Regions:
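A short glycine-rich, Lys/Arg-flanked "PGG" loop and its adjoining helix->strand segment in the class I
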Residues: 119-134
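Conserved alpha-helix/loop element of class I SAM-dependent methyltransferases that forms part
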Residues: 14-31
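Conserved catalytic/acceptor-binding region of the Class I
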Residues: 134-215
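Conserved Class I S-adenosyl-L-methionine
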Residues: 187-278
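Class I SAM-dependent methyltransferase Rossmann-like catalytic core
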Residues: 1-17
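A conserved beta-strand element that flanks and buttresses the S-adenosyl-L-methionine
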Residues: 107
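Class I SAM-dependent methyltransferase SAM/SAH-binding core
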Residues: 36, 41-95
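A short His-aromatic
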Residues: 110-114
Length: 278
């Protein structure tokens, strides 16, 4: 399973569910008594669940440091309300430390795309949940870029395709999560799409400036070099892409200096809800 830092998770999930929670309607959060959020990471979805439900909410992750962050952030968010605090438990998604039928809703967000065997995890979810299982997973193959630097979208598309071919897990799983659910024995109730927009516009924060600098130096692309070279991309083709990538990064920095740079990345997520068969 791929691991991510708390800062990365917060940054990439910032703003999710702030605009609309309609895609979560079939989770029936208001009526849930006990919810388990598996692979909770830094707790972005966990906090939404706690806000929308009066029941018990538990965050579970294999990374203890992420759990400590989630515990602290959720306590700060709801301490002024009458809702109970969110509890956290360390555990592996494929071997959950929970009894059979111990929750009535089990959720995960951007977890299955990082697992080599998502079906095994969902089978474990079926064991632990007495009623519903919901997976909120992206289709990273359908990400779109709208940028004021014309070549940025094209170059990111080329880099993403190479990464998708080289990565060892199915990072496009969101669009086909229904198949995983059915294989694991769930009755699929619904699938709803939710588009998560990540926007950069003036005034630029420090993170946006850092990303631009990493484009110009090629450092951002280099982070994924090994994975990209597991695809059909040759070393020479990677070097050509990196050269174009760095030139694009310099154009981004120039546009930022004039306050002309704007970019929106849209990541489609799919909320798949299934019911445990009696």
């Amino acid at each position: 399973m791929r691991a991510f830092s708390e800062a990365y998770l917060r940054r990439t999930r910032a703003g999710m569910w702030a605009d609309s929670r309609d895609a979560l309607a079939d989770l029936e959060l208001a009526s849930r008594e006990r919810i388990l959020d598996v692979g909770c990471g830094s707790g972005e979805l966990t906090r939404v669940l706690a806000e929308e439900s009066s029941g018990t909410v538990i965050g579970c992750d294999v990374d203890r440091s992420l759990l400590e962050y989630t515990r602290g952030s959720t306590e700060n968010d709801i301490e002024a309300s009458s809702k109970p605090s969110v509890s956290v438990v360390q555990g592996d998604a494929t071997r959950l430390p929970f009894a059979t039928d111990s929750v009535d809703l089990l959720t995960c967000q951007a977890l299955l795309i990082n697992l080599p065997d998502p079906v095994t995890a969902v089978e474990e979810f079926v064991r632990v949940s007495s009623d519903l299982v919901a997976a909120i997973e992206p289709d990273n193959g359908a990400v779109t870029i709208d940028s004021t630097v014309p070549q940025e979208a094209t170059l990111e598309h080329r880099a993403r395709n190479a990464y998708l071919e080289g990565v060892e897990t199915d990072v496009t799983l969101g669009v086909s999560a229904r198949d995983v659910f059915e294989t694991a024995g769930l009755d699929v109730l619904s699938t709803h799409r939710y588009d998560h927009d990540r926007t950069i516009s003036p005034p630029y924060d420090e993170h946006a400036l850092t990303v631009a600098r990493r484009k110009a130096t090629g450092a951002g692309l280099a982070d994924d070099r090994a994975t990209m070279l597991q695809s059909d991309l040759t070393g020479a083709e990677y070097d050509d892409l990196r050269s174009e990538w760095r030139a694009m990064g310099r154009d981004v920095i120039e546009a930022m200096q004039d306050g002309r740079y704007e970019r929106t990345e849209t990541v489609p997520f799919y909320v798949t809800v299934g019911r445990v068969q009696p």
